[in-house]
Amino acid sequence: MTLPSARTCFLLGFLFCAALLAAALYFQFSGGLEPCPLCISQRIMVLAVALVFLAAAIHHPASLGIRAYALLGTAVALGGASISGRHVWLLHLPPEEVPECGPGLSYMFRNFPLGDTLKAMLSGTGDCAKVDWTFLGLSMPAWVLICFLGLGAFSLLQWWNAER
């Protein structure tokens, strides 16, 4: 099986990320699911992967550039997977070990030092430990983890696509 060109693959990766972000916005504004700090961090990482893919598709680099974008996309996707993995881990903690709930992120950005707010965004709060939605027995953070791992593998696959 031959892969489409690297440019086409990067564009498809970008479109998949855009669909993930559109789904997140749909669940927030139509489904009434308010995102927790880790959910917002995951959205930022999906956006970062999307921007890497879009830059690669627009730039249309030669072999070395394709490999650089492939590694960058994989690294960013694995960073997102680590955030999703922490979120899934928080969901499976016993109730007595769940961190305390904190104020909303907009309040934290206005009233707390930036470092404390970023720490809350990356480590999660008690809000991150409740399951509001499942599909096929998996929570939304578990599905996002699967998507990040798939995006990372898809990006890394472009390494070999650069040889064509």
UniProtKB/Swiss-Prot annotation:
GO CC, one annotated term: plasma membrane
Cystine crosslinks: 36-39, 101-128
SUPFAM superfamilies tied to this protein: DsbB-like
Periplasmic side: 27-44, 86-142
BP-aspect Gene Ontology terms: protein folding
Residues passing through the membrane, by range: 10-26, 45-61, 69-85, 143-161
InterPro entries membership: DiS_bond_form_DsbB/BdbC (IPR003752), Disulphide_bond_form_DsbB (IPR022920), DsbB (IPR050183), DsbB-like_sf (IPR023380)
Domain of life: Bacteria
Protein role: Required for disulfide bond formation in some periplasmic proteins. Acts by oxidizing the DsbA protein.
Family, similarity comment: Belongs to the DsbB family.
Name of the featured protein: Disulfide bond formation protein B
Organism: Methylococcus capsulatus (strain ATCC 33009 / NCIMB 11132 / Bath)
Gene of this entry: dsbB
